[in-house]
Each structure stands twice: as structure tokens, then as C-alpha cells.
A protein has these predicted regions:
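C-terminal beta-strand-rich structural cap/linker in extracellular carbohydrate-active enzymes
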Residues: 147-169
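Solvent-exposed beta-hairpin/edge-strand motifs
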Residues: 128-143
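Active-site proximal loops enriched in glycine and acidic residues that flank catalytic Cys/His/Asp
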Residues: 44-48, 113-115, 125-127, 138, ...
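Hydrophobic, well-ordered secondary-structure elements that form the walls
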Residues: 35, 75, 111, 134, ...
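Acidic surface patches and DE-rich sequence motifs
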Residues: 105, 138-139, 150
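Aromatic/acidic polysaccharide-binding cleft in carbohydrate-active enzymes
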Residues: 1-76, 80, 88-98
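Carbohydrate-binding surface patches
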Residues: 94-130
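Glycine-centered loop/turn motifs
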Residues: 83-89, 131, 161
Length: 169
């Protein structure tokens, strides 16, 4: 998506690297946490399907396969777990490479963890999260639905640009 396709008919731009979709989704999740802190209730994300002539870098679907990409799955993860009336809980971020925000939601206590870097990061979570369920979108999940895990032990490794939702008591 370098603009050349407009000026040069038949030109095909290079596909973005696979990690791009995780980066774009992680950025959106980070923006969600920051706007929630400002009291903003509604965000939008563009666009569902973007063909090469229509800015495919903002698409939530792979136009070749019609399958959702990481941007879609992260948006769905946020939509399914957070909403109006959620309360932000004071949260200490362990490092500038990670973003963490706790919420009290209609589903219970949820911690949103975002790896803002293109490398693995370690995070130690509070003991009360031991045994918690985690839904995550990361490079290892590819263009598939979020992976589900149960937390056991600390610290945890978070993949590059991973977005994880930790649901605990």
C-alpha cells in the first residue's frame, strides 16, 4: 500500500508482514484502554474488507481467503469482554513495553494485557489470577480465533504484539 497502484495500473503492492496484523490489533487495544481512561465509550475500527485498491492495510479480513485476521479477532475479543458500565480498576503497569488495565465488568474481573513490543515480554501477574482463564490473540494464533489458556505460575511470557484478556475471580 505504497500509493503506486493508483498511478501505475497493474502494479501490485507487497503484502504487509504477518506481524503487521498483530501490531495493528495491539495498537487498537491500547487505544481502547487509553480512551476508556478518558471516559470515551465508543470507538470505531475501519474496515471489514479492503481490497488492494481500497487500503487493505486497514482491513479486518484477508481479501484472498475471506478469513478474519488478527485485527478482527482482537476487536471481537474487546467487544465480547468489555462494554458500557465497566469500571476501571487502578492498575500498575510493570514496564513501558507492556500495557495492563484491570476492569470490573459484567463478566467479573478482567485484566487486559497488551505487549507493545515486537519481542517477547515477561509479566508477573497478581496471585489472584492463578487459575484464571486467558483468551489471547498473538502471532501463534495466526488468522484464527483467540487461543484459550489457564494460568498456572508466574511470570508469564507474552508474544510480540499479543493482546490477552485474563478473566479471574
Amino acid at each position: 500500500e505504497d500509493g503506486k497502484e493508483i498511478m501505475h495500473p497493474g502494479y501490485v503492492a507487497k503484502e504487509p508482514p504477518k506481524s503487521y496484523w498483530n501490531l495493528a490489533g495491539a495498537m487498537y487495544a491500547y487505544i481502547y484502554t487509553e480512551t476508556a481512561k478518558m471516559g470515551i465509550d465508543v470507538l470505531g475500527e475501519s474496515q471489514l474488507v479492503g481490497f488492494p485498491s481500497q487500503f487493505p492495510s486497514v482491513s479486518m479480513m484477508d481479501y484472498n481467503t475471506t478469513e478474519p485476521n488478527a485485527r478482527f479477532w482482537i476487536l471481537k475479543l474487546l467487544k465480547d469482554n468489555f462494554g458500557l458500565g465497566d469500571k476501571l480498576v487502578e492498575t500498575t503497569n510493570p514496564s513501558s513495553s507492556l500495557a495492563a488495565q484491570a476492569f470490573e465488568t459484567r463478566h467479573g474481573k478482567i485484566l487486559l494485557v497488551i505487549n507493545k513490543r515486537n519481542r517477547e515480554q515477561q509479566i508477573t501477574l497478581p496471585e489472584e489470577t492463578d487459575g484464571a482463564s486467558v483468551s489471547l490473540v498473538a502471532p501463534s494464533t495466526g488468522d484464527h480465533a483467540p487461543a484459550e489458556q489457564t494460568l498456572h505460575g508466574h511470570p508469564l511470557s507474552r508474544q510480540p504484539f499479543e493482546v490477552a484478556v485474563v478473566q479471574y475471580e
